[in-house]
Amino acid sequence: MKPGNLFFKVPIPAYVTRDEGSCFWRSESRGAFFMDFLVEKEKNMDRKLFTSECVTTGHPDKVADRISDSILDACLAQDPGSRVACETMVTTNFCLIAGEITTKARVDYAAVARRVIRDIGYTDPGLGFSDRDVEIQCRVHTQSPDIALGTNDQVGGAGDQGMMFGGACNETPELMPLPIAISRALTNRLTEKVGENPRLRPDGKAQVSVEYDEEGKPMGVDTVVVSIQHTEDYAMEDLRAFVKQEVIAPVLKDYGLDLSAVEHIYINPTGKFVVGGPDGDTGLTGRKIIVDTYGGYFSHGGGAFSGKDPTKVDRSGAYMARYMAKNIVAAQLADKCQVELAYAIGVAQPVSVRVDTYGTGKVSDEKLTQLLRDTFDMTPAGIIRTLDLRRPIYADTAARGHFGIQGKTWEKTDKAELLRSKAGL
């Protein structure tokens, strides 16, 4: 039933008029008011918007993530068996590194942090956070032997309890939801432009609202929001023109979209954004878990990724869940798929596996769940082996994103044909 026909099934009598500027109809004979369902735009009645955000590598929380993952990489480069749980806090010219690290590697944690800060672009002392002026303190000790008992190579159990989710859908070539895919592409391009435009600074954000039809298919981009730190002398008109033409337009074009079709574009909507980075907001490892995954499109188990070696199923389990979900969608067994894994500390096999295809599956969710159990090794040791996770590959995920990024082992679709064959399709 169309919105305009919700109440009025017959032509409106001549004595029924609408007050100018009102959304109500008046019956001149009765003085009654009726909601103006007739003139409400059908588009607005049916609109379904979903919004996701992403942040640049210079965002305070991402600075912390990247330091933690760079320390993890430095340990794995020398000792692939390193056990790392590294947390970082950054604020005005201060960086605290803490956590539990058991490794044979010899790593200068402070030197790693200083290099990361420099690489991100915080080199100007005037920013209130720079590689030269930052004070760095380390409070690191070894992993608890109680935890190590259940996660050693002989036992191969999970490093903690918890549930992890992975998802995929056919909205983009990388099989990611469109809102987070565009948001991440915008922030990655912003980061590139910071290196090219000396009046831009490292801290920034992007947010994208996508309109979906009644069947859940994306129709287009409704709203784009971009905020980027800048120098004091950068005229706002010039900044907005630069971001619109050099960042937003090319990214939309990559996804087959046109800038003119976006209903709302907001660039630095509050105006001035000079104070930023860790000088503007304190950053902590693991505080951008929705940015790191699917922008809220799929569920999240609550565990962060950065600073954790692959025996921590918060990270490796989520990577495996993405790998399995992506292969299901790549096999055209579903248009949209979420995989949930759950583990008990010290236990190798997951305590539960669940597939949800939101009614888009070509076979039942129960059959897909069994196919995953028959096809993939979901033990922590099996995940590490399958995805080759004992390598220094993690700082890049903190910088560019964990999912939908080419070259990651958990982004391969090498099991799609096998799954399709096993499903009998």
Language-model segments: residues:
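N-terminal, positively charged regions that mediate nucleic acid binding
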Residues: 45-85
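Glycine-rich, mobile lid/loop segments that gate access to catalytic sites or pores
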Residues: 51, 111, 118-275, 404-407, ...
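Conserved phosphate/anionic-ligand binding catalytic regions in large, soluble enzymes, centered on
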Residues: 53-55, 59-64, 157-171, 274-298, ...
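A short glycine-rich, hydrophobically flanked beta-strand micro-motif that places a catalytic Asp/Glu
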Residues: 82-86, 204-210, 263-267, 333-344
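Short, charge-patterned binding micro-sites
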Residues: 85-103, 345-349
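Internal helix-turn-beta structural module
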Residues: 91, 336, 343-425
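Glycine-rich anion/phosphate-binding loop at the beta-strand->alpha-helix junction
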Residues: 234-328, 332
